[in-house]
């Protein structure tokens, strides 16, 4: 499952281990019990979520491939209960792929120049920075040094492996109007995938544990 985001980004589900029933099994092992019928299994997930018994959800694990601007990735990497591997600008020549916000992104802000000019200025700086990057590489400057001229709207790619408990914490903080708009879009994509793979857990999360303010308003 792959969801396109922003102008060139995406979130792609690479792998998932477990589902709603994984949390049920993990919770019932305390009583040396397993699965029961669907109604009682689903009720248990709601009970766990309502009362803050979160460790059973750590047995559901997702791996995502994410393409995002560097400034989004740096916010993402603050979520430390996860595993990350990122594209290296030291070992790879970086492509001309930059996030350019549309003029609509700036609607509602009191800028002293038109939004269209903001977009043009960002594009001009990006062009100059990338030309400089290529010139440095062609001059024999190592990639690890040449890359420092590139701005934060450069796209990077990374793998993110995270359990469902930590994923829900990510959604609490990033699927929220206080988060930057760009990372909100990625959080909405993560929520869509989470909902598809773990519908009972997602529903219980929204009902009892979600602290943000956009998932309930947006169809995910």
Swiss-Prot record:
NCBIfam families referenced in this protein's UniProt entry, alphabetically: thyX (TIGR02170)
Domain ThyX residues, every copy: 1-208
Enzyme Commission numbers on file: 2.1.1.148
Keyword NADP: yes
Pathway: Pyrimidine metabolism; dTTP biosynthesis
Top-level taxon of origin: Bacteria
Gene it is expressed from: thyX
Protein name according to UniProt: Flavin-dependent thymidylate synthase
């Amino acid at each position: 499952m792959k969801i396109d985001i922003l102008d060139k980004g995406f979130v792609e589900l690479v792998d998932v281990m477990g589902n709603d029933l994984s949390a049920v099994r993990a919770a019932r092992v305390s009583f040396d019990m397993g699965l029961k019928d669907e109604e009682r299994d689903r009720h248990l997930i709601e009970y766990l979520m309502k009362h803050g018994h979160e460790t059973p959800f750590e047995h559901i694990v997702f791996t995502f491939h994410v393409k995002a601007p560097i400034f989004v990735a740096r916010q993402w990497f603050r979520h430390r209960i996860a595993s990350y591997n990122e594209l290296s600008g030291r070992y790879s020549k970086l492509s001309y792929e930059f996030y350019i916000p549309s003029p609509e992104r700036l609607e509602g802000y009191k800028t002293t120049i038109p939004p269209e000019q903001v977009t043009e200025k960002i594009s001009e700086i990006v062009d100059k920075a990338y030309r400089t990057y290529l010139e440095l590489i062609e001059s024999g400057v190592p990639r690890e040094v040449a890359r420092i001229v590139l701005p934060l709207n450069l796209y990077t790619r990374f793998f993110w492996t995270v359990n469902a408990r930590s994923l829900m914490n990510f959604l609490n903080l990033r699927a929220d109007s206080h988060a930057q708009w760009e990372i909100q879009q990625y959080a909405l994509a993560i929520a869509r995938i989470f909902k598809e793979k773990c519908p009972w857990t997602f529903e219980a999360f929204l009902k009892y544990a979600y602290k943000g303010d956009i998932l309930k308003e947006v169809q995910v």
